[in-house]
A protein has these predicted regions:
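ABC transporter nucleotide-binding domain
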Residues: 170-258, 275
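C-terminal coupling/interaction segments
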Residues: 249-296
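Short, surface-exposed beta-strand/loop "edge" segments at domain boundaries and coil↔beta transitions
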Residues: 152-156, 233-235, 260-263
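ABC transporter nucleotide-binding domains
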Residues: 2-7, 12-205, 209-211
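Short loop/turn segments at beta->alpha junctions
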Residues: 93, 214, 277-280
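Residues that form generic nucleotide/phosphate-binding pockets
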Residues: 116, 172, 221, 269, ...
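Generic alpha-helical secondary structure signal
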Residues: 18, 73, 111-115, 216, ...
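Residue-level marker of structural boundaries
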Residues: 81, 122, 224-227, 290, ...
């Protein structure tokens, strides 16, 4: 199945500083891709390039095989977008927001949106200003989904919501995805939510995509080992070494895709090499995006 979202060698600079460095990723229909990264990693920039709000300096982002900047109105109608903060006209009533969407988006399913709003307990007559944060987030999701999109793009949709609000929003999103089967590109800081919904995870750091894989595969590929050298031996050069943290008598190593030859090098100089220590998503994320390697 062909990808409907693609980034091919995308670079973008601000003030001559690279924010994206050769970004490559693809999302197929029915797939949820979660793009993770610390603040300033380039997540929002990537989404804005995909939606045609920014141009890449090198490379290309495309949707439905069409470069983002060349998408026609009919193709844009097939894309739903929910931005961080759920920016809306706060003085509008909910029913006015529905009327606006129906007037500007030919595929907008107003009756379906009204049914979903009723299910969520959001009154049509209420001004958006007086909705809770959670209700605004649900309204933004319903408006994006009611256009029958083939692609959904979310930029931190649960930012600022409490646990209960996030759970309700995530439940709505999971239900929506099961019905639609659309391709989803999601950026988020909330790792527990990502674990529930994502088919694949990409971790962006310093504008580079460090990994791109299903969570179970990432957990297999990234590991920790305790390494105690024999007779004062130095730490060997390892292609997959992410971090080496000094501990009593040796190092705690974080390794990506440790190959048998590197493991043999470690064992040859080890008084003790522990078995692999598996990481959860939060530990994996922190190991990939914080700290520096220590050698010596």
């Amino acid at each position: 199945m062909n990808a409907v979202i693609e980034f091919r060698n995308v670079w973008r600079h601000f003030d001559r500083q690279p924010v994206l460095r050769g970004l490559e990723l693809a999302v197929k229909p029915g797939e949820v891709f979660a793009l993770l990264g610390r603040n300033g990693a380039g997540k929002t920039t990537a989404l804005r390039i995909l939606l045609g709000f920014l141009e890449p300096h090198t490379g290309e982002a495309s949707v439905f095989g069409v470069p983002s900047g060349a998408l026609m109105p009919a193709e844009r109608e097939r894309i739903g977008y929910v931005a961080e903060g759920h920016r809306m006209y706060l003085e509008m009533r909910v029913r006015d927001a529905l009327a606006f969407e129906a007037g500007t988006r030919p595929n907008f399913e107003r009756a379906a949106a009204e049914r979903e709003l009723e299910r969520c307990g959001i009154p049509l007559r209420k001004r958006i200003f007086f909705l809770s944060r959670g209700q605004r987030a649900q309204l933004a999701l319903i408006l994006a989904a009611a256009g029958a999109p083939d692609v959904l793009v979310f930029d931190d949709p649960a930012m600022g919501l409490d646990v209960v609000m996030r759970r309700e929003l995530l439940g709505s999103l999971i239900e929506l995805l099961s019905e639609r089967g659309c391709a989803v590109l999601l950026s988020s800081h909330i790792l527990t939510d990502v674990e529930r919904i994502a088919d694949r995870i990409g971790i962006l750091h310093g504008g580079e995509l460090l990994v791109d894989a299903p969570l179970d595969e990432l957990k297999r590929r990234v590991e920790k080992r305790q390494w105690i050298p024999s007779n004062g031996a130095g730490l060997p050069e390892l292609d997959g070494l992410l971090r080496a943290r000094r501990v009593d008598g040796g190092y705690e190593l974080t390794l990506l895709d440790l190959d048998p030859l590197d493991e043999a090098r470690l064992r040859a100089k080890a008084a003790r090499l522990s078995e692999r220590i598996a990481l959860d998503l939060e530990e994996l994320f922190l190991e990939l995006t914080t700290g520096e390697e220590t050698h010596g």
